[in-house]
């Protein structure tokens, strides 16, 4: 409570007045930050923010998945969530930053690179977005969330939070002279004031942080050597006393494994030598530590020697690289996969492709039951062939004896006997004659195979009023667009989609092509895609000109409707 309230009290200071005790010759840099006590306030502010965020994520965000802390970008850089929360809230919140495109500025102010804007946005959504909205509702006095009940938070911390939020609200009303009209306005106002002081404090600490990092890196080498000695000692202890706890993987090894997973071909990571050369390498190598750690984790026996005996059974060819003296980690087979390819006596079964093939079941229990042939054809066999539709039976073919047969080998007999050969009436006459002849030859199969709804025969199921309505919707050239089908369904509710599509392809499109072949036989473009492309190039704003003709698909299981 004290840290939060002191920051809020500092906002009420009138900075237009110059203190009398301030020396004009003293520069702002010469003022000791410790004298103002603001560094202590920032630390207390962060100490209240972090446990609240940890408890909130564990309480409300555990269902969405595990959120590791600290948060890291895709490049492996750690993100200061407190600084990110201050910067986003200072610029108006997540929605305002996204609408204004200010994520690059937020990323730079948060100490990240410009290409980390996408990662920072994702981290804010996962970690801080719900937390910020929850704080805004608490400040506004929402009865559902005003009582802070988070697991893992002490009563003293809850009291500090409640006191801080109430004081922020009081300071905002005192400064503005009215209550906040927008949800979260008090918290945004307070954070805007706090961010300016936090930035000054953060810049002042930056130089000291760089020195601390160098000092830490210098001591890190000695710490690593000590860790290697401890690892070597633990190897002896584990083999001599199997009852002790298993080996733990060092952080450096885990970092090396993470780098290998990101880019296995990175030359800076080094290469893994041949298995025969492993003995000459010490345990300080990351890959050697990783192998020892894996062996300790996969060892189920009490004796350490049994694990190495099992490892010795692995064939050396698994670790040999045909291209050179080293091999890639990704090309290595695991011991468990190789063990499955071994028989009981240790002989190889075959390649991995042969292992994946299903085994053929051989024996009397796995044979198909085939009845013995008696030489007599049972009458029940015909039921497996279904019902014969065509060719017709002898009784049905008696009516077809009077059908005029075409002469074989004579070819097409031209010209026809019509008054106007090649006219529309001539073509319709010959099509009708051929259809009637086919109807006599097929018999009932003519209707079962839906020949009666092919071509202009579809018109027999349409009334004159329905034809007049659907022709009024047709464009030139005709197009089977979704808008056309929707309008046709509106004015013809009794017609299904299948009937409308059938009419388009069997009547409208054929009549249009027939007119084209007679009127402009040398200038026919039947490709509807070309029409769409030309309309797009001319940038015709009319939606009808840019309609792309999509195929209308019908389900084969749908019943035929006339």
Curated annotation (Swiss-Prot):
Domain (ARID) ranges: 43-136
UniProt feature coiled coil, ranges: none
Keyword Zinc-finger tagged: no
Main localization, broad class: nucleus
UniProt keywords, alphabetically: DNA-binding, Nucleus, Repressor, Transcription, Transcription regulation
GO-annotated molecular function: DNA binding
Segments forming domain ELM2: 358-448
Cellular compartments per GO CC: generative cell nucleus; histone deacetylase complex; microsporocyte nucleus
Record flagged with keyword DNA-binding: yes
Subcellular location(s) per record: Nucleus
Matching CDD domains: ARID (cd16100)
SUPFAM superfamilies: ARID-like (SSF46774)
PROSITE patterns noted in UniProt: ARID, ELM2
GO terms under biological process: pollen sperm cell differentiation; positive regulation of gene expression
Transmembrane segments: none
Pfam families given in the database record: ARID (PF01388)
PANTHER family according to UniProt: AT-RICH INTERACTIVE DOMAIN-CONTAINING PROTEIN 1, AT-RICH INTERACTIVE DOMAIN-CONTAINING PROTEIN 2
Protein name according to UniProt: AT-rich interactive domain-containing protein 1
């Amino acid at each position: 409570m004290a840290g939060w309230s002191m920051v809020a009290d500092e906002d009420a200071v009138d900075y237009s007045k110059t203190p009398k005790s301030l020396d004009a010759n003293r520069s702002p840099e010469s003022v000791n930050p410790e004298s103002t006590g603001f560094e202590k306030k920032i630390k207390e502010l962060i100490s209240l923010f972090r446990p609240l965020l940890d408890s909130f994520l564990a309480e409300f965000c555990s269902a969405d998945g595990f959120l590791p802390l600290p948060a890291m970008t895709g490049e492996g850089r750690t993100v200061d969530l407190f600084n990110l929360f201050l910067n986003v809230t200072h610029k108006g919140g997540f929605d305002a930053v996204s609408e204004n495109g200010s994520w690059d500025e937020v990323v730079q102010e948060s100490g990240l690179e410009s290409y980390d804007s996408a990662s920072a946005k994702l981290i804010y959504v996962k970690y801080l977005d719900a937390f910020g909205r929850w704080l805004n509702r608490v400040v506004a006095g929402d009865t559902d969330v005003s009582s802070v009940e988070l697991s893992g938070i002490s009563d003293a911390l809850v009291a500090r939070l409640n006191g801080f939020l109430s004081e922020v609200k009081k300071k905002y009303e005192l400064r503005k002279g009215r209550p906040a009209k927008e949800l979260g306005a008090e918290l945004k106002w307070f954070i805007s004031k706090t961010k300016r002081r936090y930035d000054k404090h953060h810049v002042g600490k930056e130089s000291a942080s760089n020195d601390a990092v160098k000092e830490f890196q210098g001591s890190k080498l000695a710490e690593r050597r000590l860790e290697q000695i401890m690892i070597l000692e633990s190897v002896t202890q584990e083999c001599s006393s199997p009852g002790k706890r298993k080996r733990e993987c060092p952080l450096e090894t885990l970092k090396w494994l993470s780098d290998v997973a990101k880019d296995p071909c990175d030359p800076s990571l080094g290469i893994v030598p041949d298995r025969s050369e492993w003995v000459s390498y010490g345990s300080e190598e990351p890959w050697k530590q990783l192998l020892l750690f894996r062996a300790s984790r996969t060892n189920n026996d009490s004796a350490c020697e049994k694990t190495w005996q099992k490892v010795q059974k692995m064939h050396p060819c698994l670790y040999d690289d045909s291209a050179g003296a080293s091999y890639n980690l990704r090309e290595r087979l695991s011991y468990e996969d190789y063990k499955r390819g071994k028989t009981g006596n240790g002989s190889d079964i075959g390649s991995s492709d042969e292992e994946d093939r299903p085994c053929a079941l051989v024996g009397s229990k796995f044979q198909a039951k085939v009845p013995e042939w008696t030489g007599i054809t049972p009458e029940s066999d015909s039921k497996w062939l279904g019902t014969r539709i065509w060719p017709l039976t002898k009784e049905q073919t008696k009516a077809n004896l009077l059908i005029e047969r075409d002469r074989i080998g004579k070819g097409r007999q031209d010209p026809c006997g019509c008054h106007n050969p090649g006219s529309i009436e001539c073509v319709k006459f010959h099509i009708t004659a051929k259809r009637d002849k086919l109807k006599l030859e097929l018999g009932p199969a003519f209707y079962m195979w839906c020949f009666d709804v092919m071509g202009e025969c579809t018109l027999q199921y349409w009334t004159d009023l329905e034809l007049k309505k659907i022709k009024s919707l047709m464009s030139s050239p005709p197009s089977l667009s979704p808008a056309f089908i929707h309008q046709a369904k509106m004015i013809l509710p009794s017609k299904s989609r299948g009937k409308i599509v059938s009419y388009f392809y069997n009547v409208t499109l054929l009549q249009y092509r027939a007119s084209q072949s007679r009127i402009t036989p040398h200038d026919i473009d039947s490709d509807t895609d070309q029409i769409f492309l030309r309309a797009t190039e001319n940038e015709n704003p009319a939606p009808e000109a840019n309609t792309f003709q999509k195929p209308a698909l019908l389900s084969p299981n749908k019943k035929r409707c006339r």
